[in-house]
Amino acid sequence: NASSCCGMFSWVTLPEGFQIGGLFNTRGIKDMNLMFAGCVMPKGFSLGDHFHTKEVEDMRYMFYQSSVSEAFDFGKIFDTSHVMNMEYMFSECRIPDGLKFPERFLTAQVTNMDHMFYESVFLGKADFGDGFVVSPGTNTNDMFTDCMFGDEKIDNQYNQDFNYVKSRLS
């Protein structure tokens, strides 16, 4: 059994209509480092109903430098309740208007959010949901440094202030 999907879809352009189907089994995977890094996703791309993440501990660079598609869907079972490292997870990403983080995008146990959204471009609103929190002691160095809200660059005095960013994108 595999324990890592590291780099699986890195730096590829997924074809129009591509979906992760029911035969793609991620149960037991602990490491999704770089899984979709640099990936260009087709419009409406979904991780689907079989993309298990409940056992994953490491999502470093998972979507680093990717172009997240319009109407991207994390799927019904995307669960980050055991993830401890989200370093650079969405860094240098293009994040579409209306991106909704799933209900099970839970971050209370994450200890490293260093550069999580560094230099990302938010093209509009984003719904982080209620489970996305920053716990005391979590490394948030440069979490939002040099991010763009449309054409406006974030003032770096807020580069570690999740509540400020969340209010700006709501």
Give the residues covered by each predicted segment.
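Negatively charged
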Residues: 1-170
